[in-house]
Every structure is written in structure tokens, then in C-alpha cells.
Amino acid sequence: MAEQNQRTNTPDNGSEFAIQRLYIKDLSFEAPRSPQVFLEEWQPELNMDLATKVNDLGEDNHEVVLTVTVTVTMKESHIFLAEVQQGGIFTIKNFPKEEMRPMLGSFCPNILYPYAREAITDMVVRGGFPQLYLAPVNFDALFEQHEQSEEGNSGTEDRVH
């Protein structure tokens, strides 16, 4: 069985993808209007922003950091801000160059998002607010959109999506 798993992770061309480590790089929660906000009727407006940063660590290792920022307002008043930078170190070997950008810009953030979402929802509940449901994100579509907007610009390994 272990042999079979190893073969599925390393195709005939010797390509390899491995998660080395997942970690929280930064975590922040601000609720400037608590406790007064708890006495008001709960009618929030939620805004979520996403950003991805990729750092080449050498020797086929890459750090991918997904930043998820959730801002909740009510009647134009800032209720809370929750932000997490969920990081991961990924080993990516022997993939064609044209596959590297989608792996780092879409595939890796897809792996990181559930962890970031869990950290955000946990912070919000611990802050005394109702649990948030953050919908799944189509990182493939976001990556395509980013690539189209960056067309013509020369890319670097360190970039923000």
C-alpha cells in the first residue's frame, strides 16, 4: 500500500509534490466596539479579502502564505476585523515550468484555505460573535483572473495575488 501511494505521488517523470509544514504566520483580531455591539441587533455586512505571497526557499522548497482578511461592519460602523496569514512550505520537484505558477498560485492556496478559514471562524467565536461561514473559494478562477490582469508584466517568484 505504501508503495502504491508513493507511485501516485511521483509520476514517471519523477515529479514530486509534498507538504513540508503548515503554520500560522500571523493572527489578528480587533473588535473595537465590544461590548456595546453585543447589545445591538445583529445585522452584519461581511467583506473578505484574499492575498497570496510566494517565496522561493531554494532546493525545490517554496513558502506560500495565504492572507485572509474578514471585515464585518454594521450600519457603516466597524464591528470586527479578523486576519490570518496561513503559511505552508511545499516541496515541488521536476514539474514543467508552466505548471509551477498554477501550483503555487492556485493548488497550494487551495490546501491552505481550510486552515485559514478555521482560524478565522475560531477567532470570531472566541471574540463573542456568532460563528461565520466562509464559503469555499475557487482559487483556480482567481489565479486565471490574476494571470490575465498580469499579462505582459514580467513575473517574479515573490508576488501577491
Curated annotation (Swiss-Prot):
InterPro entries: SecB, SecB-like_sf. It holds the Pfam family SecB. One of its GO terms (biological process) is protein folding. GO terms for cellular component: cytoplasm. One of its GO terms (molecular function) is unfolded protein binding. It is found in: Cytoplasm. Keywords: Chaperone, Cytoplasm, Protein transport, Translocation, Transport. Its main location: cytoplasm. One of the proteins required for the normal export of preproteins out of the cell cytoplasm. It is a molecular chaperone that binds to a subset of precursor proteins, maintaining them in a translocation-competent state. It also specifically binds to its receptor SecA. PANTHER family: PROTEIN-EXPORT PROTEIN SECB, PTHR36918. HAMAP family: SecB. Homotetramer, a dimer of dimers. One homotetramer interacts with 1 SecA dimer. Belongs to the SecB family. This is Protein-export protein SecB. The lineage of its organism: Bacteria, Pseudomonadati, Pseudomonadota, Gammaproteobacteria, Legionellales.
